[in-house]
Structure formats: C-alpha cells, structure tokens
Amino acid sequence: IDGKAEEKVWEAAPFSESFIDIEGVKIPKYDTRVKMLWDDKNLYFYAELKEPHIWATLKQRDTVIFYNNDFEIFIDPDGDTHNYYEFEMNALNTVWDLLLVKPYRESAPVVDSWDIQGLQTAVSINGTLNDPTDTDKSWSVEIAMPWEVLKEASGSNDVPADNFWRINFSRVNWDHDLDGSTYSRKKDASGKFLPEYNWVWSPQGVINMHEPEHWGYVYFSTKPVSEEVAFTIPQDEQIRWKLYEFYRAQKAYFSENKMWAT
C-alpha cells in the first residue's frame, strides 16, 4: 500500500466515472475517480483527486478531517441504513473512522472510538504538499480495509462474493486563503467559512451523505479483474426505494404535525 496504482492488477481495474456534485446537477471543477479491488483478506480502494493546490493541516487521528480537503468512503454492508461505516482521510494521510448506529436524522449515537483494526493507508502527491509557490496536479490515496472488521455489520461471516453492498464515495473541497505560505479555509466578509464543495460517486440529491438509501451498489464479482460484469439491481431493492419514500413522507408529516399520518 503506497498510494499508487502501478501494479498490474490495479492497472487492469477500471476507474469509476468522474464524481459529480452531491445534488447531482453541477459538474465539479476538479476531477475525482475511484477504483476498487478485493481478495479474501481485504477490500482495496484507490482514488485519484485532481487539484492545483494540495494542502492539509490536520494530523490527529479521529479529528474532523473534512475541515481539510479530503476523500471519504461510506459503507453499509447489509443495506439497512443502520450500523454503517464512515472513513475520511486527507493529504497528510490522517484518518477518521467511525461507526454510525443509525443516520444522524434518528439522533442515534456515533461510535467515534471505533477503529478499523489492520487498516492500511497511503497518500501519493503528484506535486507538492502545502507549498503555494507552484501548481500541483493531483493526489492519490490507496486504502486496504480488512474483511474481518467490515463483516461485523454485514450479518454474515462470509466475504460478499458475487453479492453487493451499499457504498458511496465523497470528496470535500474548500476554497482556500493564504497567510504567507499557510493554507486555510476561505472566509467571507463577515468571517464565516465559505461552504464546502461536495463531490460524490453516486449523487445523493441533497447535501447530506448520511442518507444511506441513496448510496450506490458495489458488486463483488469473482470473475477476473479485466472482465466486465453485468449487474442488475434486484427487484427487492426497488421495493425498498418506495418504502423509503413513504418513510421520508412520514418523517416530514411528523415534523410538521407532531404525529404520524394514519
């Protein structure tokens, strides 16, 4: 794990389509793509993030990494929107990993002390880090997450061969200011931070990654890496989409009327 994808198996793995704005409308100003591999030990991720100014300041694990530009992974093994994982890392290879019992909308506890035992991560910089005197090209991340940890929320002891999980990827990017040679998040005239950009693999439709029902489907094929696989979303999943529409309507009704619709 070195932050690069120069091995033949990585070269054979296709990139995703370029990320899109989280609401699914605007095209991001910097390109982001991701690819994945798996074996019987780990789930592997590689992401390439184009950027002319690569900077990061946070060095303590489990701080709020998205206060820097970052790359994020969200994993819901059994697709029930409960007991899902969030992972974030910046260009300094500082990580934040946590377990969410339920989405924030349910006011459930967040297990910030949860760590991915055996996690391996690396960053590669195509340019310079924290140097505003030049123009950078990109930074890339490589990540290995052990199945032994990820399976804890899957309801199964097996690797999901020829099966799917709900997963999404996010990239948070900030406009920046410079104080001499030090980067920081840009503020408006009133001193408030400008809003971040949120670029994702599977659009959420809203500025909120914590609606797991909108995440994408990742299918774990047992075929050779270079062989294309046709994946069709099961009919049961389409029924589940309709049930989530009903759920959101009920939540909206309760918020306004302080009672459930009957």
What are these regions (language model features)?
Residues 245-262:
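Short, glycine/small-hydrophobic-rich surface segments
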Residues 1-247:
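Structural preference for beta-rich elements and adjacent junctions enriched in aromatics
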